[in-house]
């Protein structure tokens, strides 16, 4: 029986609806951890003032590319910008690892008939987190490089690597073995993976647009809300990819 996108969408939404409470708690918890880590590792207010003091200069160079703007910064400004970027990247990576590990564990255990909370899902995924951390770091780095050089290679790599976390968590395969198998399966089943990935990307952009217009929220609260909603979208994609991989294995 051929695998159809409609069947996968229906199964994914049913699982998402039935486990909404646990998934929502997992999305909020990992969002809070991400924002907390970002706050902890970001430069302090005095250092950030170094960047804000030259805000007028940045506005005047709006027509320039990012590389030209960075080259015009002083060494102090470049160092502060590097710290801000590193804090944001590290916190997002840790949050994504916890979300992916916890979500895949939740899906697997619920599929086996067990009831599990968000905290227990993260705890049960602990043995897999180091491997997932390395996997997501490599995949994120390659995708970002592809997007920076030219958008299309980054999108293609995102699609190719989409099944790698599921393979790693489910079959306990190594990082590179998971990436290799993911590329093979993703391209062979592009007709059901590409639409889901495009919907995921569109939903993420929609969430970003919506939250950016909620001016009543403080920056920290807005960050938690944005990250939590983004995590919910990613959780739904993980359910879809997990279900797809289970069908491909059978």
Swiss-Prot record:
It holds the Pfam family UPF0259. The chain crosses the membrane at residues 23-43, 87-107, 132-152, 156-176, 192-212, 222-242. Keywords: Cell inner membrane, Cell membrane, Membrane, Transmembrane, Transmembrane helix. Its main location: membrane. GO terms for cellular component: plasma membrane. The keyword Ion transport does not apply. The keyword Cell inner membrane applies. It is found in: Cell inner membrane. It is a multi-pass membrane protein. Belongs to the UPF0259 family. This is UPF0259 membrane protein Spro_2675. It comes from Serratia proteamaculans (strain 568). The lineage of its organism: Bacteria, Pseudomonadati, Pseudomonadota, Gammaproteobacteria, Enterobacterales.
């Amino acid at each position: 029986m051929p695998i159809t996108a409609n069947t996968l969408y229906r199964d994914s939404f049913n699982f998402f609806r039935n486990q909404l409470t646990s998934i929502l708690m997992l999305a909020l918890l990992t969002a809070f951890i991400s924002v907390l880590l970002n706050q902890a590792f970001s430069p302090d207010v005095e250092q950030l003032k170094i960047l804000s003091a030259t805000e007028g200069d940045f506005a005047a160079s709006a027509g320039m590319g990012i590389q030209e703007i960075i080259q015009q910064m002083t060494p102090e400004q470049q160092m502060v910008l590097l710290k801000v970027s590193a804090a944001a990247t590290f916190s997002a990576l840790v949050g994504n690892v916890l979300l992916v590990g916890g979500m895949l564990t939740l899906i697997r255990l619920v599929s086996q008939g067990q009831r599990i909370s968000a905290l227990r899902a993260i705890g049960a995924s602990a043995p897999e987190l180091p491997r997932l951390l390395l996997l997501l770091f490599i995949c994120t780095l390659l995708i970002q490089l592809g997007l920076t050089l030219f958008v299309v290679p980054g999108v293609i790599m995102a699609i190719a690597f989409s099944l790698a976390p599921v393979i790693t968590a489910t079959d306990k395969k190594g990082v590179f073995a998971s990436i290799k198998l993911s590329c093979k399966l993703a391209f062979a089943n592009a007709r059901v993976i590409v639409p889901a990935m495009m919907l995921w990307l569109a939903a993420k952009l929609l969430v970003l647009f919506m939250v950016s217009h909620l001016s009543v929220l403080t920056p920290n609260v807005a960050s938690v809300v944005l990250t939590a909603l983004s995590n919910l979208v990613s959780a739904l994609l993980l359910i879809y990819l997990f279900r797809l991989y289970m069908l491909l294995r059978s």
